Amino acid sequence: MNKQQKPKRSPLRPDYLVIVIIILLAIGMYFFFTEMMAPKVKQFDEFEFIAAIESGQIATVRSEYVGGDNFNLWEVTGTFTTGNAPEGVGSYVIILYGDRLNNIQDIIITYNELNPSTPITVSFVPHVSVDFWNIISTLLLIAAPIVLVVIMFRSMSSQSNKAQDFTKNRAKLSQGRKVKFSDIAGADEEKAEMAELIDFLKNPKKYADMGARVPKGVLLVGQPGTGKTLLAKAVAGEAQVPFFSISGSDFVELYVGVGASRVRDLFKVAKQSAPCIIFIDEIDAVGRQRGAGMGGGNDEREQTLNQLLVEMDGFSANLGIIIMAATNRPDVLDPALLRPGRFDRQITMQVPDQKSREEILKVHARSKKLDPTIKFSEVAMRIPGFTGADIENLLNEAALLAARESRTVISMQDIDEAADRVTMGPAKKSRKYSPNEKKMVAYHEAGHAVIGLKVNLASTVQKVTIVPRGRAGGYALYTPVEEKFNYAKSELLAMITSALGGRVAEEIMFDDVTTGAYDDFKRATKLARSMVTEYGMSDLGPIQYESDSGNVFLGRDYLKDKNFSDAVALEIDREVRAIITECYEHARKVINENKNLLDNIAKYLIAVETLTKTDIDEIAATGQLQWWDNREVEEDSKKSE
């Protein structure tokens, strides 16, 4: 398809019309200045010329034939003797008939006989000589307007072609290495769903004979980075068919009708390449519900969507064209786009679980030099919620860190640091705590660790650190005991208790509090409110008080439906406060019962600054951190020596 599109002219390439104008100006200026700078020529009549010869004013005479077959004309030119040239004049010229030239020659012969010391030099050119410069300049003056007219017509034609190119589709035909299913990990169910599409593209006759209709459109739904585009490429790579990819925003332009024209052109090209796959990324840019949003609809977008609907439902089911699209906002799509016969199948790309993350790590590690001792299962456990794109970025960051330190392989330490950089930002090593501030941050993070160790169903603390990153002075990395689709009320209460552990530790140990619990409160309040208004986990009963409004404003749901009274709103606030208070008191009770553990974890945090799960478990079991204590002993012994 790209071959049909004319190559675009470089922005640095000058316009042909400008070049022609510059050339014409240069020629005109050349002749103008040549004329201005050239010495003046005296034009004689015959009697003046004879008088000048007889008075000794003429030094040279050059006769050149300039007439044709019917006119015996001669051009006589020459120079004056010294001191006899008129002011500003360098030469003379006179045109004579042949018989009059003979008379002039006789006069010159007589003059030379009388003045042998200062004779007139005579030269004779019997044939016409060609003046190439005059011919070239004449031809240029004749040809320039013709060339100018031709270029103007070509420019007009080019503008017309540009207008046509403006309405052509911008889909790109995928070339180069084909993506295969082996390049995709952690999406076994999604790949199985796509298997029949691949079989249809390879063996369409088998389905046609059975009277089966393969889905015309497949909509891939999922969070950003879950592999929607990669899966679509893999389907095309496995089926060995052309793959046309385009973004939804490429259809929409300022001018009404352009998007619809591009849709028509896209399907025209696809029919010529069938069987093939058309992939529309971010289809919500063009497929958003018609008439929705502030200010009503958008004529250009709606016309484009209408044309897309017609094309999807208009071509024959046996053409072998499958439409695939991706979006992370299926709620904003027009219902007509999702009905059977168009996008009649939806495949949800889930955020990978621990097993899937491990498989994805193995795929992205193929091109990386990793330490053989690294266990992918441990890495996968430490990065809950990471998508495939996040994992690729994680390993790339780890590779950059290893290369920066001139190491030959990527270590587990590099991966840990990369995970921290991806989630929280780079460490702010230049920022220094005051001793009191460092102690408060250490006890805050130690409070989270104690709750994770002592509260049943609380998430496991994989790491705590007091190294500042981003806006956080320190943070604790949690991983759930088990990744689930559904969570019990007791598990949600444990999550809230874990979030409040840091503030409780500050209050108990310092009888003061800091702003460090800002994000903890945000997470705890959101969970508690969801328990009351969405999950029915309060005394208000199994009623959903808040839900998505379903109204799309500028592509995003800004509002929540309020289907309850102000009195109920007050009850909701009381229930949320009751949940937070209950969890806060529970955290206080646990911290008070485990003050020694809190002190030990905080003590080592102040010294080491970062503790792993292994370190925390050792401190909880023995009250010590052996590797650090041994290191302290060695340093003390060196100082004493």
UniProtKB/Swiss-Prot annotation:
Keywords, alphabetical: ATP-binding, Cell membrane, Hydrolase, Membrane, Metal-binding, Metalloprotease, Nucleotide-binding, Protease, Transmembrane, Transmembrane helix, Zinc
Gene Ontology molecular function, alphabetical: ATP binding; ATP hydrolysis activity; ATP-dependent peptidase activity; metalloendopeptidase activity; zinc ion binding
Transmembrane segments: 17-37, 132-152
Cofactor binding description: Binds 1 zinc ion per subunit.
Keyword Transcription in annotation: no
InterPro entries: AAA+_ATPase, AAA_lid_3, ATPase_AAA_core, ATPase_AAA_CS, FtsH, P-loop_NTPase, Peptidase_M41, Peptidase_M41-like
Positions in the Extracellular compartment: 38-131
Residues that, per the record, bind Zn(2+): H444, H448, D520
SMART domains in alphabetical order: AAA
Cofactor(s) needed: Zn(2+)
EC annotation from Swiss-Prot or TrEMBL: 3.4.24.-
Biological process (GO), any one: protein catabolic process
Secretion signal span: none
Membrane topology: Multi-pass membrane protein
Matches recorded under PANTHER family: ATP-DEPENDENT ZINC METALLOPROTEASE YME1L1, METALLOPROTEASE M41 FTSH
Record-stated family: In the central section; belongs to the AAA ATPase family. In the C-terminal section; belongs to the peptidase M41 family.
Subunit structure as annotated in this protein's UniProt entry: Homohexamer.
Protein name as annotated: ATP-dependent zinc metalloprotease FtsH
